[in-house]
């Protein structure tokens, strides 16, 4: 009888352990591991995902990694993107839905030489732009900043052409290109275009609509743990940095420290609505602004991409990880 009870107990424990097994969840970033992804690596390092019942795999993006396509093909559950790219994906039949964000504003900035004191001084300059600029912020900039007649050249992801020509303005990211300028012992003004009214969020968490419908609990757990990871990372990034450097062997302590300092300086994670709504918060008015921008610039067809249904607040609205 005792042996029989022992067998029942063992079976019960086995079933209990099986039911508690962590659920696999794959998250793909938009670049090599860096400080801008620190909160996710912090959540991984501190077992926040594990404690939430998830077995999270973080995959790095990169210059030739088409994360939206990979997510659509089932290679990732959620990705880092932005709400503009998510809307544009609907135009191509990919139902990608923002569920939260990392940055309360875009990380895109214009780097200028010291003679540019304000947006009015951009007139007559030549701009170095990456290819994706033409389907994202450049149509907005041409209209909002009166740059319709501006000369443009390809941005080759090197700061040398910019440093060599005082008439150039270069696109960049608040956390990246200014570091390269600093390392070259040069000077540049940094103008985040969000300060001039560019509405999209930066580094949003975007998931397939089908994933949200089939696995809402997993998405909710991932979002909540990630936001706590971001709060912890900005307080003490040590644990996350270990994983970042393990994944990206080219990443230095100096560059990580610069990225964190820039995120704090510009309140990229903690500013705006995050002050009261919590880290990662997204709101309908902000999302609507981006949708309207794309419609106005004929980058999406509102008949094919209606605003309703293109986003969800259900996972982030009640998380409220206050900075």
Region spans (language model):
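Structured segments of extracytoplasmic/periplasmic soluble domains
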Residues: 43-46, 52, 70, 74, ...
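Conserved C-terminal helix/tail region of periplasmic/extracytoplasmic solute-binding proteins
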Residues: 285-323
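Short, glycine-/small- and polar/acidic-enriched structural segments
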Residues: 23-164, 168-172, 191
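Hydrophobic helical h-region of N-terminal Sec-dependent signal peptides
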Residues: 7-15
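Pocket-lining segment of extracytoplasmic ligand-binding domains
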Residues: 84, 157-253
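Sec/Tat signal peptide C-region and signal peptidase I cleavage site
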Residues: 16-21
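Secondary-structure end/capping motifs
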Residues: 215-299
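Bacterial N-terminal signal peptides that target proteins for export
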Residues: 1-7
């Amino acid at each position: 009888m005792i042996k029989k009870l022992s067998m029942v107990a063992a079976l019960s424990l086995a079933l209990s352990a099986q039911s508690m097994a962590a659920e696999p969840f794959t998250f793909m970033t938009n670049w090599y591991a860096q400080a801008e992804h620190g909160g996710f690596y912090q959540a991984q390092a501190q077992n926040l995902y594990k404690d939430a019942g998830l077995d999270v795999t973080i995959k790095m993006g990169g210059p030739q990694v088409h994360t939206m396509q990979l997510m659509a093909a089932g290679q990732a559950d959620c990705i880092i993107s932005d709400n503009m790219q998510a809307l544009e994906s609907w135009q191509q039949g990919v139902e990608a839905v923002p569920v939260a964000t990392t940055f309360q504003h875009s990380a895109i900035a214009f780097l200028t030489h010291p003679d540019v004191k304000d947006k009015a001084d951009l007139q007559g300059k030549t701009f170095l732009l990456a290819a994706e600029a033409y389907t994202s912020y450049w149509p907005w900039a041409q209209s909002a900043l009166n740059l319709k007649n501006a000369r443009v050249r390809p941005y080759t992801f090197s700061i040398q052409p910019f440093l060599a020509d005082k008439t150039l303005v270069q696109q960049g990211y608040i956390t990246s290109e200014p570091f390269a300028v600093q390392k070259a012992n040069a000077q540049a003004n940094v103008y985040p275009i969000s300060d001039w009214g560019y509405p999209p969020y930066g580094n949003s968490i975007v998931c397939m609509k089908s994933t949200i419908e089939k696995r809402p609990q997993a998405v909710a757990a991932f979002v909540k743990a990630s936001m706590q990871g971001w709060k912890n990372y900005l307080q003490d990034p040590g644990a996350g940095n270990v994983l970042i450097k393990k994944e990206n062997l080219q990443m230095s302590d100096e560059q990580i420290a610069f990225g964190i300092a820039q995120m704090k300086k510009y309140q990229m994670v903690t500013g705006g609505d995050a002050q009261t709504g919590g880290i990662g918060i997204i709101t309908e008015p902000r999302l609507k602004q981006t949708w309207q921008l794309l419609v106005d610039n004929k980058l999406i067809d509102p008949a094919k991409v209606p605003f309703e249904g293109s986003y969800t607040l259900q996972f982030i609205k009640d998380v409220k990880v206050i900075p």
